[in-house]
């Protein structure tokens, strides 16, 4: 309705603290609780419950509800300007300037960090009191300082006990290794017996098999004695050939690089020569056009002077005078911006000077 609507005013003079609603006993909830056997001043819940002994006056007070009108977490409080941000860093800087030791500065910084952490925990989770787990479960603490002193020598005895155990474990490992070696020797003997039996059965190929066995034994002994192969003359020759081939390859690569450099230099020279030729041709064409125009204009001027009647001597004029109207020639003036705009202006001025006889007399310093 806006300003034209009915105005409902509430006066708080009768209830300035707004506690009338909490003292009202005629509400719907009060009636239901009384119907269930509850009376004002009693606790909620079963009277014979196991946790009834923990009930306090807090169970009789009202549940306080606050309106959450921000996006902060539950229990978070806004910064009302109580904390001065950057003060700890400033104090650290002052301590360094005053010549405090690093240990003292670290201790002060640790205290500041602990205070910050406690404030953060208090804002985030509220007040927290840590209790030992034994008390929560119901354990009983029986340990005393005398018992701790008695337990210390027992620990030394237990530390001495593992030494013989370690010796026994070493003996067992040695026995296992000896058993494994015996098994390997037995297997080798069996294999050698089988080979001998096969050699006796094959009468015709006894000599060949013996020679093969001897060769294989020689190869094994040579491989065991010398781990690295000896350098024979053949291997030395092969190494020399490989080195020579590598050197030849290097020389070939160098020659190829030189040829490439020469080709690149020639190409660059050819490009420069072509550019110079083009520039010279352009300059010659421009100069030829200018000379041709000037010659034709002079011829026409002489013909006109011969045919025209003798008149009074021409009055001297400025070099900047316009072109004569009767010449019949006009210099084209470029309208747009071009690359040779300044050049074209210079050429036009030259043409105007050649067309005007008075200007030519002034240029060649001839008195008429």
From Swiss-Prot:
**What InterPro entries does its record include?**
G_patch_dom (IPR000467), PINX1 (IPR050656)
Any Pfam family: G-patch
Q: Where is the composition biased (Basic and acidic residues)?
A: 176-186
Quick one: a GO biological-process term for this protein? rRNA processing
* Residue ranges, compositional bias (Low complexity): 310-337
- Biased composition of type Polar residues is found at 15-24
The record lists its disulfide bonds as none
Name under which the protein is recorded: Protein PXR1
What species was this sequence derived from? Chaetomium globosum (strain ATCC 6205 / CBS 148.51 / DSM 1962 / NBRC 6347 / NRRL 1970) (Soil fungus)
The organism's lineage is:
Eukaryota, Fungi, Dikarya, Ascomycota, Pezizomycotina
């Amino acid at each position: 309705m806006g300003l034209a609507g009915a105005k409902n005013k509430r006066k708080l003079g009768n209830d300035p603290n707004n506690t009338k609603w909490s003292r009202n006993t005629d509400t719907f909830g009060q009636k239901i609780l009384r119907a269930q056997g509850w009376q004002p001043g009693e606790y909620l819940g079963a009277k014979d419950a196991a946790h009834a002994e923990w009930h306090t006056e807090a169970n009789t007070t009202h549940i306080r509800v606050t309106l959450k009108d921000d996006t902060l977490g539950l229990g978070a409080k806004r910064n009302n300007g109580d904390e001065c941000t950057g003060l700890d860093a400033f104090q650290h800087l002052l301590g360094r300037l005053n010549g405090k030791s690093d240990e003292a500065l670290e201790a002060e910084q640790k205290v500041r960090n602990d205070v910050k952490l406690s404030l953060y925990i208090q804002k985030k989770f509220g007040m927290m009191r840590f209790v030992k787990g034994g008390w929560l479960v119901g354990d009983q603490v029986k340990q005393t300082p005398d018992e701790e002193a008695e337990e210390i020598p027992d620990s030394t005895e237990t530390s001495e006990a593992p030494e013989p155990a370690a010796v026994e474990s070493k003996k067992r490992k040695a026995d296992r290794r000896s058993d494994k070696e015996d098994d390997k020797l037995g297997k080798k003997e069996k294999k050698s017996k089988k080979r001998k039996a096969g050699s006796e059965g094959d009468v015709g190929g006894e000599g060949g098999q013996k020679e093969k066995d001897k060769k294989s034994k020689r190869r094994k002994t040579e491989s065991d004695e010398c781990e690295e192969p000896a350098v024979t003359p053949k291997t030395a020759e092969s190494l020399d050939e490989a080195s020579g081939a590598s050197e030849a390859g290097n020389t070939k690569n160098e020659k190829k690089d030189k040829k490439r450099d020469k080709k690149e230099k020639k190409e660059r020279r050819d490009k420069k020569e072509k550019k110079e030729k083009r520039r010279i041709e352009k300059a010659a064409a421009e100069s030829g056009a200018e000379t041709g125009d000037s010659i034709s204009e002079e011829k026409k001027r002489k013909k006109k002077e011969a045919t025209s009647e003798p008149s009074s001597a021409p009055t001297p004029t400025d070099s900047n005078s316009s072109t004569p109207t009767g010449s019949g020639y006009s210099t084209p003036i470029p309208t747009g911006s071009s690359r040779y705009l300044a050049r074209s202006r210079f050429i036009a001025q030259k043409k105007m000077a050649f067309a005007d006889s008075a200007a030519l007399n002034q240029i060649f310093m001839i008195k008429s």
